[in-house]
Amino acid sequence: MTLSFAHFTYLFTILLGLTNIALASDPETILVTITKTNDANGVVTTTVSPALVSTSTIVQAGTTTLYTTWCPLTVSTSSAAEISPSISYATTLSRFSTLTLSTEVCSHEACPSSSTLPTTTLSVTSKFTSYICPTCHTTAISSLSEVGTTTVVSSSAIEPSSASIISPVTSTLSSTTSSNPTTTSLSSTSTSPSSTSTSPSSTSTSSSSTSTSSSSTSTSSSSTSTSPSSTSTSSSLTSTSSSSTSTSQSSTSTSSSSTSTSPSSTSTSSSSTSTSPSSKSTSASSTSTSSYSTSTSPSLTSSSPTLASTSPSSTSISSTFTDSTSSLGSSIASSSTSVSLYSPSTPVYSVPSTSSNVATPSMTSSTVETTVSSQSSSEYITKSSISTTIPSFSMSTYFTTVSGVTTMYTTWCPYSSESETSTLTSMHETVTTDATVCTHESCMPSQTTSLITSSIKMSTKNVATSVSTSTVESSYACSTCAETSHSYSSVQTASSSSVTQQTTSTKSWVSSMTTSDEDFNKHATGKYHVTSSGTSTISTSVSEATSTSSIDSESQEQSSHLLSTSVLSSSSLSATLSSDSTILLFSSVSSLSVEQSPVTTLQISSTSEILQPTSSTAIATISASTSSLSATSISTPSTSVESTIESSSLTPTVSSIFLSSSSAPSSLQTSVTTTEVSTTSISIQYQTSSMVTISQYMGSGSQTRLPLGKLVFAIMAVACNVIFS
C-alpha cells in the first residue's frame, strides 16, 4: 500500500509531538535584559531568564493542537523611582495562547483537489484589570487585547521554510481618582500591532500574515488618534510611521503606513500619540527571527487642554514634550523551531513551533507643556505630567482535558501589593508684562512709566491616595525702583475631612544712591583730583507666613488656628569705594527664621559686599518628616555666586541643589539632583510539564528525558498501522 498524503501528514504530526518532548528535555537558555532610563521614573530593568520551552500536542480528528508555554520562567524586574505614598493594587491578569495545526485543501489551480496542506494557527488572548481597595477611592486600570490570528499555508516546494510570528497587543489605561470635592479622570489608549513573517526560500511559497489592531482613540479636548491595521506578507518588511497634523486648537493625528520589500524579517511597531495642538510620538521597534523575537511596543496618549487666547489675531501656540513618552512593555516570542521530514519522493514541509508571549510590568510617564502667547505679552503655560506604574504579578499554569482535547491556561495571579502610584500634575502659569506707572512712593511723584511684570502660577498635584495639593503663586516686579512682591498659597487635601492651607507673602524694595568722595589734597600743580567714589545700597525685605486650617466634613465644624507667624525685616547698608589701595567698608546682615508646623521651613538669607571678588556661602541643613528648605547667598557685583537649595515633599526623599556662578569673563552653572530611591524586585517562577498524545498506542504523561526505546516502538507501531490499513 502506498503512503498517501493524509498518511504522511499523520506521521508528520506524530513526529512533531515526539520532537516537542525532546525540546522539553533539552532546554534552551535565553537571557533578555531591557533597561530604560527616564528622568521622571529613574531606571527600570527587566530581566527574563531562563527560557525553557514546554509544549503539549493534542491529536484529534486529523487536527493537531500544540500548546506552548515557558518552563520554568523567571521574570525579575527592578526599578529605581521616587518614593511615593503607598497604595495597594488588586491585579488580575489572564493570558491564553494556542497553536493549532490542521490541514486544508490547496486552492491553487495547478494542484489536484486531493492536495491537503498543513495549516498553523496562533491565537492569543489577554485580559488585565487592576483596581484599588474601594476605601481608598476607586482607581481602575484595565487592558483587553483582541484576538490575533496568523495563518500560514505552505505549498509543495523543495526545502521551503516558513515561520510566522504575530504579537497583537492592545492596551487601554484608564485611571479615575475620586476625591472630594474634585474628580480627576485619565485615560490613555495604546495600540501596538506587530507582525513578522519570514520565508527564506523563494520557491513557490504562498504565505499570508495578517495582524489586526483596533483603532486607538484618545479624547481629551478634541484630540483623536487612529492607528490603522498593519499587514505583513512573505519576505517583506512592514513599518508604520506616525505623523501628526495640527489644526487650530483641536488636532487629529493619523498614522500612515509604508511597505517595502526586503528579504529581512524585521517589523517595526509604531505608536501614534496625539496631543492638542501638537504631538510627538515615540515608537519602539520589534525584531523577529525564526529563533527569537522581542517586541517592545509602548504607547501613551495624552493631550493638553484647549486654551483660548485673549488676542486671536496675534496668537502663537506651541506644544512640546518636555519629557518624552516612555513605557516599558516586553512581549517575548522565543524558540521558534522548525521540524522537517525529508523523503526523496515526497514534498518537504516545515512547521514552526512558537512559544507564547510573556508580559512584564510596564511603567509609563509623560509630560506635556503647552504655551500660548498673545499681543498683551501674556503667556499661558500648561504642564500635564502623568506617571503610572502597573504593579507586579505572579503566574500559574494548568491544563484541562475535555472530550480528549487538552487546553492549557496560563493565569497571572494572584495580585501583589506594592507601593505604586498614579500621579497627575498640572500647572497653569500666566506672565503679564505691561508698561504702566508703579505705585511705589519713589515712582509715583515722577510718574515714571516702568515695566511691571506680574506672574500667577497655579499647580495641582493629585496622588492616587487622594492627597491633593493645590498651590497659587503670584509675583510683582518693577523695573525702576526694583520693588518686588511675592505671594505663595498652598492648599493640601489629605482626605475628604482634612484641609491644610498655608500662605506666604514677601515684599521687598531697594533704594540706591550714589555719592562721590573727593580728596582736596593739592598736587604740585595745584589741581584737585578725585581719589575715590562709591555706591551705597539699602534693601529691606519683609516676609510673612500665616494660615493653617482644618475642616471636618463629617461634623461640618471648622477649627482654624494660626500655627506660626514670622516677620523678617533685614536691612543692610553696604558701600564700595574704589581707590588705589584701601578697603573701606564691609557689612553683612543675616536673618534666620525657623517655623515649626506641619511643614517645617528654614530660611537663611545673607547679603555681603567687599571690594575684592570673593564668594559668600550660606549652608543650611534640616532633617524632619516634612521639610522645606531655602537658602540664598549673594556677593559682589563683579563676581556673583548664587546658591539655591530647595527640598519639599511628603517625605524627605528628593533634594535638588542648584549652583550658579557668574563673572564678567565666564559663567558656570552646575545642577545636582539627588533622589532617594526604593528598589523593588519581583521574581516569578513556575514549572509545568508537557503532555503529548500519540494515537492509541502511547498514553499521555510527563517526560524529562527522551525515551528513545518507547518512541521508536511507537513510530513503528503507528507506521505499520498506517501502511497496512
Swiss-Prot record:
Function: Cell wall anchoring subunit of the a-agglutinin heterodimer. S.cerevisiae a and alpha cells express the complementary cell surface glycoproteins a-agglutinin and alpha-agglutinin, respectively, which interact with one another to promote cellular aggregation during mating.
Any one cellular-component term (Gene Ontology): cell periphery
The encoding gene: AGA1
Keyword Isomerase: no
Domain statement: The number of the intragenic tandem repeats varies between different S.cerevisiae strains.
Subunit structure: Heterodimer; disulfide-linked.
Signal peptide: 1-24
Stretches forming Sequence repeats: 53-149, 182-188, 189-195, 196-202, 203-209, 210-216, 217-223, 224-230, 231-237, 238-244, 245-251, 252-258, 259-265, 266-272, 273-279, 280-286, 287-293, 294-300, 301-307, 395-493
GO MF: cell adhesion molecule binding
Topology class, membrane: Lipid-anchor; GPI-anchor
Keywords: Cell adhesion, Cell wall, Disulfide bond, Glycoprotein, GPI-anchor, Lipoprotein, Membrane, Pheromone response, Repeat, Secreted, Signal
Propiece span(s): 700-725
Protein's cellular compartments: Secreted, Cell wall; Membrane
Region span, 2 X approximate repeats: 53-493
Segments for region (18 X approximate tandem repeats, Ser/Thr-rich): 182-307
GO BP terms, alphabetized: agglutination involved in conjugation with cellular fusion
Residue positions of covalent lipid attachment, annotated as GPI-anchor amidated glycine: G699
Post-translational modification: Extensively O-glycosylated by PMT1 and PMT2.
Protein name as it appears in the record: A-agglutinin anchorage subunit
Stretches the record annotates as Disordered: 168-318, 335-363
